[in-house]
């Protein structure tokens, strides 16, 4: 990808204790720390030339029965 992109990420952590599936996680790690690592690795893997191309980000953390990371990247066009 060469131009600006939008990055949508959902961090899904294993359900534990009193937490329920789909509940937002409001504890550490911080989303900014998670995102920095992810964007650096995605740059290294060749998803884009530079993580500065990420012009829009949506980041959420959840407790989930099925843990993992959901990632969607889309190129952004010019705003009218």
Question: Where on the chain are the PLM-derived regions?
Answer:
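Acidic, proline/glycine-enriched N-terminal capping motif
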Residues: 1-80
């Amino acid at each position: 990808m060469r131009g600006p992109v939008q990055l949508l990420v959902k961090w899904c952590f294993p359900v534990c204790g009193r937490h329920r599936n789909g509940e937002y996680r409001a504890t550490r790690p911080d989303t900014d720390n998670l995102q920095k690592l992810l964007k650096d690795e995605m740059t290294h893997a060749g998803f884009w030339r530079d993580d500065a191309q990420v012009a829009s980000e949506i980041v959420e953390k959840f407790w989930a029965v099925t843990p993992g990371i959901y990632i969607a990247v889309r190129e952004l066009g010019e705003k009218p």
